[in-house]
Amino acid sequence: MASELAMSNSDLPTSPLAMEYVNDFDLMKFEVKKEPVETDRIISQCGRLIAGGSLSSTPMSTPCSSVPPSPSFSAPSPGSGSEQKAHLEDYYWMTGYPQQLNPEALGFSPEDAVEALISNSHQLQGGFDGYARGAQQLAAAAGAGAGASLGGSGEEMGPAAAVVSAVIAAAAAQSGAGPHYHHHHHHAAGHHHHPTAGAPGAAGSAAASAGGAGGAGGGGPASAGGGGGGGGGGGGGGAAGAGGALHPHHAAGGLHFDDRFSDEQLVTMSVRELNRQLRGVSKEEVIRLKQKRRTLKNRGYAQSCRFKRVQQRHVLESEKNQLLQQVDHLKQEISRLVRERDAYKEKYEKLVSSGFRENGSSSDNPSSPEFFM
């Protein structure tokens, strides 16, 4: 792998910014694919067509669309030594980019291609912050030292590469999800859950500056069109990032009404009044408050029932004690009456046995023992 990546010093750019851009990527992750002679010819044709300003976002599988261009070395213009840089286009630098470039399918201008790619950017599976940063550095180096830092001309950062870099930066600013493909940065999407309006706008401006630098370095109608497309892509990314910063569930208010309504207010408030107070509140918050109100009502009903049961039990116990006292009193009365009855019966038996009756007793005296009862 190292022997295949080895290149002569004349082919490598001597700018420190370009070398830093190359060092930002883990080159061991990229696949090196050697194509036959026909594939090299097709690649050169695709490079010339892309440099002419015709881009397409259709995912069709064609010989031209199967080999994407290089980020830092676009198709060279005629007479710029294409034999020395032809093997550089064999490196697949966009391994995670799902959109295929097919210049022969539709006759899109660079502006139309940028808009089409941005509109379909939700299909991307990861961000390309490293690519955008490297493209910005290369574009700045190409604009500052035209001919000194990148081999003597701005052709190293061609218009097609500038347009593609601007599209990638805009897509990364708009999607804002997925892991970053730096060699040492592997952040989850949740770490960037609270975006600000300034960061996506900065990414969009960086993409616009990269596109403008590519257009200035190329020189000619096609280069000017590529620069304009890159600037448009950057602006779109900045606008999308600024809009994405205002996510609905990150509102500063919080929409939590626990402090606004006390438990007593939730229980005593009527349903109509509660619905009037909850106008404009999210559905989840309304459901949560109504469930809390129902729980408080059930809890209050259970406490009321428990209190009533305890109170009724106390009343019944007091009545039971009173009834037991009355029963005891009645038992005492019964026992007293039984004793009196026994005493009278014994007295009667004594009188009968002593010969109470006499022979000449008058009829006024009772003759039946029941009289003494």
UniProtKB/Swiss-Prot annotation:
Residue stretches of biased makeup (Gly residues): 211-222
Tissue: Expressed in endothelial cells.
Effect seen on changing residue 317 to G: In CTRCT21; uncertain significance
Signal peptide: none
InterPro entries attached to this UniProt entry: bZIP, bZIP_Maf, bZIP_sf, Maf_TF_N, TF_DNA-bd_sf, Transcription_factor_Maf_fam
This protein's record includes keyword Repressor: yes
GO molecular function: DNA-binding transcription activator activity, RNA polymerase II-specific; DNA-binding transcription factor activity, RNA polymerase II-specific; identical protein binding; RNA polymerase II cis-regulatory region sequence-specific DNA binding; sequence-specific double-stranded DNA binding
Pfam families: bZIP_Maf, Maf_N
Superkingdom of source: Eukaryota
Compositionally skewed regions (Basic residues) per UniProt: 180-195
Subunit comment: Homodimer or heterodimer with other bHLH-Zip transcription factors. Binds DNA as a homodimer or as a heterodimer. Heterotetramer of two MAF and two USF2. Interacts with PAX6; the interaction is direct. Interacts with MYB; interaction takes place weakly in normal T-cells and increases in T-cells following stimulation through the TCR engagement. Interacts with MYB; the ternary complex formed with MYB and the CD13 promoter is regulated in response to differentiating signals. Interacts with USF2; the interaction inhibits its DNA-binding activity on the L7 promoter.
Family according to the record: Belongs to the bZIP family. Maf subfamily.
Disease per record: A chromosomal aberration involving MAF is found in some forms of multiple myeloma (MM). Translocation t(14;16)(q32.3;q23) with an IgH locus. Cataract 21, multiple types: An opacification of the crystalline lens of the eye that frequently results in visual impairment or blindness. Opacities vary in morphology, are often confined to a portion of the lens, and may be static or progressive. In general, the more posteriorly located and dense an opacity, the greater the impact on visual function. CTRCT21 includes cerulean and pulverulent cataracts. Cerulean cataracts are characterized by peripheral bluish and white opacifications organized in concentric layers with occasional central lesions arranged radially.
Protein name, entry field: Transcription factor Maf
Organism annotation: Homo sapiens (Human)
